[in-house]
Amino acid sequence: MGARMTRAFRNFNVEKRAEQEISKRKPSMAPKHPSTRSLLQEHLSQYPEIEEEVSRKDNKLLSLLRDVYVNSKDPVPSLPVKAIEPQQQPKEFRLPIGDQFDKNIKDIPKGKITVVEALTLLNNHKLSPETWTAEKIAQEYHLELEDVNSLLKYFVTFEVKIVPPEDRKAIQSK
């Protein structure tokens, strides 16, 4: 039903709309500069055969043009060869601790740690802060001392507290 309606609207008064479009004024050529116009008139008055040559059709050239078939392909752009620059910081690769992460993470660059390692170092620092100082952690995991201090200060692991049952007071029913 929808196609039938759109076809009716599309074909409504087609002849009149086509006639109006054809009868519209076509855009004219931009006006030439007065000096150019005078030079063209002067040149055409000196050589009148140029106007004939321009307006004449050359059948030989037209037949050659009909025989031309262009088959083009874009050229493959040549990639610029970049000089291999040495890496600024050598990477140290470690495998993460634990079996659950060995499938996802293949290597860890120097200066980075995994979540498991972060939790391990936080737990070690929490259990014995005098042995696991920020300097020792930074040296052990190849981290910046400032980052380790921020990690120890702002990152807190979960703590589960179980409230003993004797502290609870029973609610007596009325």
Swiss-Prot record:
One of its GO terms (molecular function) is calmodulin binding. Phosphorylated on serine. Prolactin stimulate serine phosphorylation. It is a lipid-anchor. Its main location: mitochondrion. GO terms for biological process: defense response to virus; mitochondrial respiratory chain complex I assembly; NADH dehydrogenase complex assembly; negative regulation of apoptotic process; positive regulation of cell population proliferation. It comes from the Eukaryota. The keyword Membrane applies. GO terms for cellular component: mitochondrial membrane; mitochondrion. The modification Phosphoserine is found at residue 35. Residues 15-38 are annotated as: Disordered. The keyword Membrane applies. Residues 15-24 have a biased composition (Basic and acidic residues). Induction: Expression is low in quiescent cells and is induced in exponentially proliferating cultures. Expression is also induced when prolactin is added to stationary cells. Induced by dietary differentiating agents such as butyrate, vitamin D3, and retinoic acid. Keywords: Calmodulin-binding, Lipoprotein, Membrane, Mitochondrion, Myristate, Phosphoprotein. Disulfide bonds: none annotated. A lipid is attached at residue 2 (N-myristoyl glycine). May be involved in cell proliferation and survival of hormone-dependent tumor cells. Involved in the assembly of mitochondrial NADH:ubiquinone oxidoreductase complex (complex I). Belongs to the NDUFAF4 family. This is NADH dehydrogenase [ubiquinone] 1 alpha subcomplex assembly factor 4. It comes from Rattus norvegicus (Rat). The lineage of its organism: Eukaryota, Metazoa, Chordata, Craniata, Vertebrata. The gene is Ndufaf4.
